[in-house]
Amino acid sequence: MPEGKKVRIRVRTVSCVYVGDFLVPPMRHRVSDAINEEPRLFISLTDVLINDKDRSDFVAINKNLIESVAEL
């Protein structure tokens, strides 16, 4: 099992809203710290609800498409 803290977040992109679990690595304390890491081009969500109707086990979202992120 991966180490870190699982956080439920809402990610709003240009075309969709995703609500899913994001794993914050142990060396990071905040969601924003993990998302803003330079080498990271995508963020991964698990147990995802897409636009309040569709479900997916996993989604990778290109950071360049993200408009906002909020912890739930």
Where are these regions (language model features)?
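Conserved RNA-binding domains used in RNP assembly and mRNA/RNA metabolism
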Residues: M1-L72
